[in-house]
């Protein structure tokens, strides 16, 4: 079994696409509108995992506690500098634990994003 994507329902599609491209480093794999009130963008990493951004006009929840997505980065210091340059609030870390270092930000939809640099 292979986890192929996660879906985030959003009312901020354009802002979300920019976040996942510029901060996380994903690239748009495909984008389409299956119906007049629905737009979908899939953003992909270099290993094939995708984030599906779904805008369908329905209300989104502000209660996203307990949900987070983790993304491995090459350099935590460089990623932290990028995040700060974009005025994105860091709400946890940077923290060093055995095997890795990480910090947390929120995407435009309030989803917690953990950015991780594994020790090599």
Whereabouts are the PLM-identified features?
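N-terminal beta-strand motif that seeds the catalytic metal site of vicinal oxygen chelate
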Residues: 1-15, 67-71, 119-120
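Short glycine-enriched loop/turn motifs at secondary-structure junctions
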Residues: 1-2, 61-66, 96-97
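Core segments of cupin and vicinal oxygen chelate
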Residues: 7-48
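Short amphipathic alpha-helices within nucleic acid-binding modules
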Residues: 19, 77-82
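Vicinal oxygen chelate
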Residues: 31, 42, 80-120
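Short hydrophobic/aromatic beta-strand element in the GNAT-like acyltransferase core
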Residues: 40, 50, 70, 102-104
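Short, charged/polar surface micro-motifs in flexible loops or helix N-caps
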Residues: 46-50, 60, 75-78
